[in-house]
Each structure stands twice: as structure tokens, then as C-alpha cells.
Swiss-Prot record:
This is UPF0301 protein BceJ2315_30870. InterPro entries: AlgH-like. HAMAP family: UPF0301. GO terms for cellular component: cytosol. It holds the Pfam family DUF179. Belongs to the UPF0301 (AlgH) family. Disulfide bonds: none annotated.
């Protein structure tokens, strides 16, 4: 049994799905881990845009969004848990405090309260953000087990991949942080 000090904390890491990922929900995904502890893990898929854009989502929740560059930004599938709930991964806003925010080691925040969307709608919110519906969640030890079965690669997250890289390029960009590409990966695990 490992001591708490022996645990690896994967908060602020990318999980990159391996080709042998058994769960089709996560095939080809990059997950940003917002929280990882002995109780489990919570993350957001960052490379699965949906057909919903900010304008239509804001209309659904009775918020007026008139900032033209934001209207057609896609909302992302964040994972299969709580898919009716919004999760906003964003850079902190100096002097702002949102009702349900969690600071992530590495400088980002995840907010689940509507007030961050109200701030976005008025132009006072975070300038760089990613909005998801749903999140990915793992119980105690579940993620570690999936990693040990070669289901995921892990690498320190880079906010430029989250916010500045087109969604369809995020998987390869995250792999690039490890110095590999998808063509170098095999769906078979082996031992020398």
C-alpha cells in the first residue's frame, strides 16, 4: 500500500487516450485534469466540440450574448458525467471571484456557476476559456488502474493547447509534448 506522499498527483496534466482505449467515449480524446486526489479524479475533454455554440447555449439559459467574436465558439463535450451541467475552464480574471470556482495548480480555474457566463456575456469575464457540458470522473484508484493498463498517457498540460490550438489539432499537439505522434502509437501493450 502506498503512502500518501508516494501518490502521484495528476492535477494540471493532460490525459491522452491510447489507441487501445476500451471506452469509445474517450477514444481519441485529450482530457485536462482539474482535480486528482485519493478520492478520485475530475477532468474535462478539451477536443470534442459539439454542434452547440455559445450563442445557442446562452439563449437556452436566458443570457444575452452580443459579443460577435464569441457567438459561434463551440461548446465542448466535457465527458459523460453531468452532461446537462456547464463547466468553464478559464484563466483567472484579476479581481473577479465566481461562486463555484476551483483553482487548478498551474494557474487555471474551473467554474461551474452561471456568474462566470454572465461575466463573459458582458465582456468582463475571462478572455480565454473553454466551456463544456459534462465532465469526466473517476472513483478512487480507477484512473490509476486505467493508466497502469496503458489506457492513457500523461503529460504536463499546456494552456496554449487548451485555448490557442484548434480542437482538431489538440490530440497531436498534446502528444507532441511527449515528443511522439499518433503514428508512433500502438494499440498493443507489450513487455520486453
Amino acid at each position: 500500500m502506498s503512502k500518501p506522499s508516494d501518490r502521484i498527483n495528476l492535477t494540471n496534466q493532460f490525459l491522452i487516450a491510447m489507441p487501445n482505449m476500451a471506452d469509445p467515449t474517450f477514444s481519441g480524446t485529450v482530457v485536462y485534469l482539474c482535480d486528482h486526489s485519493e478520492r478520485g479524479a475530475l477532468g474535462l475533454v478539451i477536443n470534442r466540440p459539439t454542434d452547440i455554440d455559445l450563442e445557442s447555449l446562452f439563449n437556452r439559459i436566458d443570457l444575452k450574448l452580443d459579443i460577435e467574436p464569441l457567438l459561434h465558439i463551440p461548446v465542448y463535450f466535457g465527458g459523460p458525467v453531468q452532461t446537462e451541467r456547464g463547466f468553464v475552464l478559464h484563466e483567472p480574471v484579476e479581481g473577479a471571484s465566481y461562486n463555484s470556482s476551483m483553482s487548478v495548480d498551474g494557474g487555471l480555474e474551473m467554474t461551474t456557476s452561471k456568474d462566470v457566463l454572465e461575466a463573459v456575456a458582458t465582456g468582463t469575464g475571462p478572455k480565454r476559456f473553454l466551456l463544456t457540458l459534462g465532465h469526466a470522473g473517476w472513483g478512487a484508484g480507477q484512473l490509476e488502474e486505467e493508466i497502469s493498463r496503458n489506457g492513457w498517457l500523461t503529460v504536463a498540460a499546456d494552456p496554449r493547447i487548451v485555448f490557442d490550438t484548434p480542437a482538431e489539432e489538440r490530440f497531436e499537439a498534446a502528444l507532441g509534448l511527449l515528443g511522439v505522434s499518433s503514428s508512433m502509437l500502438s494499440g498493443e501493450a507489450g513487455h520486453a
